[in-house]
C-alpha cells in the first residue's frame, strides 16, 4: 500500500513543478518583452507670416535655440509706411465720425438759411419773368424759343431752391442715424486696418517658437520671400518620443501609461525611462526601417513612448531597445 502512495506523491510533485515552471516562464515572458524602435524628435519649419526682403538672420545650423529668441528680420520699411498710412486713415475717420455726432453749428445753420432766402428770391424772379414771357408769347411778340428759355431758368431756380431748403432742414434736424452709423463703420474699418498694419510690422521679426537645435538654414539675407516660405528648420528639444511596433500577441502588455526602460548603444548599462503614450488602433505591416528579428510581414501596432528623462544624447532616428519588465515599474 505504501508503494502506490509514494508513486502518487511523486506524480503530484512532478505536476506541481511543471505547473509552477509554466507559470514562471509565462510571467517571465510577460515581463521580459523586448521591442526595437527609433528616436522620433519633432521638427518645425519656421517662416515669416508676411513676405518681403530678408534683411538679416542671426543663427546658423547647429546653433542651440531658445524659445522667444530673435532669429531674423525682414526689411521693415514697407510695413512702417503702411502703418503710418493706417494711422492717418484712423485720424480721418475719427474726425468724420466726430463731425457727424456733433451736428451743425449755429453759424452753418444761419448760412444755410441765407442761402434759402437767396434761392427763393432767384426763383421768384424767374417765375415772374416766365409769367411775362408767357403773355408776350401769346401776343406773338416773342418766339417759342424765348419762352422755353424762360421756363428752363424758372425750373433751374426751383431746383436750386429745393436743394437749399433740404440742406437747411438737415442742418436744423442734425445728421441722419444712417449717416452716423456709416461714419462709425468707416472708423471701425480704419481701426481694423491699423491693427493689421501693426501685426504685419510685428511679424517682420522671426521669433523661435520653442527650444531646440537649428537643423537647416534655407535662405540667406537679401532673398525675396513669400509669406509662409520656409526660412529655418528647428529640431525641438522636447518632447522626445520613441516609435516602436508590437505584434498582436503582445499587444495586451502595451497599455498607455506603462513604464518602460529604453536602452541605446551609447549607454547600454544606464537606461532611459519612458511611458507608453499612444497605441495605434490600426494594424499595419512592419515598416522596413524597423530593426526587429521578427518577420516583417507580420501585422503590428505602432507605439509612441514618451522619454521622461531625455537628454541631448538622443538624436533623431537613433535605434533604441525597448524593455518591458518589473525593473521599469520600480526604478
Swiss-Prot record:
Protein name as annotated: UPF0194 membrane protein YbhG
PANTHER family in the cross-refs: EFFLUX SYSTEM COMPONENT YKNX-RELATED, UPF0194 MEMBRANE PROTEIN YBHG
Signal peptide residues on this chain, from the entry's feature table: 1-19
Domain of life where this protein originates: Bacteria
UniProt keyword list: Coiled coil, Periplasm, Signal
Family: Belongs to the UPF0194 family.
Compartment annotation: Periplasm
NCBIfam families from the UniProt entry: PRK03598.1 (NF002939)
Lineage: Bacteria, Pseudomonadati, Pseudomonadota, Gammaproteobacteria, Enterobacterales
Source species of the chain: Salmonella typhi
InterPro entries: CusB_D23, UPF0194_membrane_YbhG, UPF0194_transport
A GO cellular component annotation in the UniProt record: periplasmic space
Coiled-coil regions listed: 140-209
Keyword Lyase set for record: no
Amino acid at each position: 500500500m505504501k508503494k502506490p502512495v509514494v508513486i502518487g506523491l511523486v506524480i503530484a510533485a512532478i505536476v506541481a513543478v511543471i505547473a509552477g515552471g509554466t507559470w514562471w516562464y509565462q510571467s517571465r515572458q510577460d515581463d521580459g518583452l523586448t521591442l526595437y524602435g527609433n528616436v522620433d524628435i519633432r521638427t518645425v519649419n519656421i517662416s515669416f507670416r508676411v513676405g518681403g526682403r530678408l534683411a538679416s538672420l542671426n543663427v546658423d545650423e547647429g546653433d542651440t535655440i531658445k524659445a522667444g529668441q530673435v532669429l531674423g528680420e525682414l526689411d521693415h520699411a514697407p510695413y512702417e509706411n503702411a502703418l503710418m498710412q493706417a494711422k492717418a486713415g484712423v485720424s480721418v475717420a475719427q474726425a468724420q465720425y466726430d463731425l457727424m455726432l456733433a451736428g451743425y453749428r449755429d453759424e452753418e445753420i444761419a448760412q444755410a438759411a441765407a442761402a434759402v432766402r437767396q434761392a427763393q428770391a432767384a426763383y421768384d424772379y424767374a417765375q415772374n419773368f416766365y409769367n411775362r414771357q408767357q403773355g408776350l408769347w401769346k401776343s406773338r411778340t416773342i418766339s417759342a424759343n424765348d419762352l422755353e428759355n424762360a421756363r428752363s431758368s424758372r425750373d433751374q431756380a426751383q431746383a436750386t431752391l429745393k436743394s437749399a431748403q433740404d440742406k437747411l432742414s438737415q442742418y436744423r434736424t442734425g445728421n441722419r442715424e444712417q449717416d452716423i452709423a456709416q461714419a462709425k463703420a468707416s472708423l471701425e474699418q480704419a481701426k481694423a486696418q491699423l491693427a493689421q498694419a501693426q501685426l504685419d510690422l510685428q511679424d517682420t521679426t522671426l521669433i523661435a517658437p520653442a527650444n531646440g537645435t537649428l537643423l537647416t538654414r534655407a535662405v540667406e539675407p537679401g532673398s525675396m520671400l513669400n509669406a509662409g516660405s520656409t526660412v529655418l528648420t528647428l529640431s525641438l528639444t522636447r518632447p522626445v518620443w520613441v516609435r516602436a511596433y508590437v505584434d498582436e500577441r503582445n499587444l495586451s502588455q502595451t497599455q498607455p501609461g506603462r513604464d518602460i526602460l529604453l536602452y541605446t548603444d551609447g549607454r547600454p548599462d544606464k537606461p532611459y525611462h519612458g511611458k507608453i503614450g499612444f497605441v495605434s488602433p490600426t494594424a499595419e505591416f512592419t515598416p522596413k526601417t524597423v530593426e526587429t528579428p521578427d518577420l516583417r510581414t507580420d501585422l503590428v501596432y505602432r507605439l509612441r513612448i514618451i522619454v521622461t528623462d531625455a537628454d541631448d544624447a538622443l538624436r533623431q532616428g537613433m535605434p533604441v531597445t525597448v524593455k518591458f519588465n518589473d525593473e521599469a515599474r520600480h526604478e
